[in-house]
Amino acid sequence: MSKLFISTTNVGRAHEADIFGLSISTPYTVTCSGDGWIKLWKNRLLEGDLPKNNVISKFVHRTGVHHVDAFHSVEHGGVELDLVACVTFSGELVIYSVNMKQLAVEQVDLFSSSDKQKSYWCVKWFKSSDSEIPHKLLATDVKGSTRVWNLTVSHTEDADSRLQLILHGEITAPVANFATSCDMSPKGLIATGFENGSVIVSQADTLRPVYNFEGFGIRGTEESGRTVRDVKFSPMGELLAVANDSGSYGCVTLYETEYGERIGNLTVPTHSSQASIGSFAHNGWVFAVSFNSTGEFLATCGYDSKVRVWDVKMRERLSTLSLSAGDIEIEEDILLEDEFGDSLKNPPVFGVSFVEKGVRGGTGSDTNEGLCCICLDRSIRWYREAGGI
């Protein structure tokens, strides 16, 4: 079995500096960059529309922005929420409200004074499908704690006053360690990944840890660590995918969440002499993982300039996209070298996300899923699965 993805559109030099974050909501593909801007790229493009002519840009902070997550929901009474949370290199956590009719992005002040004193790193929204469970916002700080807020929505005429973030509590790391990533499952579990290679899974209601997973790749030395780059729960919350370093390689490990047992690793053949004692998903660090809407497939991306799609049940690779600077459609937007003169002919991939059916415009988007990725050549690429049109 294999899956074929074809390019639908792309944009080179999408930002003036490296693109570090990617998030897909129904209206927009959202990116953030070291240039200090977040950009909201319209998803439903008509034939002939160019992405750069259909983007909303918002300057956040001069130090740059490294994490971003978008939230879109239609609440009871038809109240539509479109929020973007991002974290700057100064450690500030910022939330914006998007007015889709006016194409305006405005900052909303939802944090208490104690919230603002923290220095944050990763941010993640959780969209609840249960009316009894509030939407949540998660954010890790540089000391390893994960703060959890409940998002409440009241029905008022003033769009800003109807939103409230109420601190639910904080998950404190057993030892101080940099918390690199976080996610929440619909089964009420929160996963936090750490620089030392561990992942702590906690209950969202009590904030108490229930599992502690360790990396299963080759143990890194002090010079080549085992940092966890990303954690993602499957849509039903039954699985947890963990991407971590193993020296200069990238590992992806799957765990089931009911009993906290390791299922196995996603593996491709490698020419490394250490292959017999390690299981590698990429020949470079894995920066991001993304489940599709059914949880059947997992997309991964890495420093090896590749995006891979895997069958989760069989743990088999179904597709590999090898990215090249020449993929970019507009020649003057191709970036062949970085500011240090290093080649970007085959750019590392910093982020990847599945795109649900019906989100993107164009032929086949209503019947086929897609992919979106961001690369070190400051580009954004969109794909859709071939066939079924």
Model-identified regions with their sequence ranges:
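Short loop/turn segments that connect beta-strands within beta-propeller blades
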Residues: R44-L46, V98-K101, T152-S154, A204-L207, ...
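A short helix->beta-strand "capping" segment at the edge of beta-propeller domains
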Residues: M1-E16, K52-N53, L165
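Conserved strand-to-loop turn within each blade of WD40 beta-propeller repeats
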Residues: C32-D35, V87-S90, T140-K143, G193-N196, ...
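Blade-level signature of beta-propeller repeat domains, shared across WD40, Kelch, NHL, RCC1
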Residues: G351-I389
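Conserved loop/turn motif of beta-propeller repeat scaffolds
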Residues: T26, V74, V79-L81, S129-P134, ...
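WD40-repeat beta-propellers
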Residues: I38-K42, L93-S97, T146-N150, V199-Q203, ...
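Canonical WD40 repeat/beta-propeller blade segments in eukaryotic WD-repeat proteins
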Residues: E16-S23, R62-E75, K116-S128, P174-D183, ...
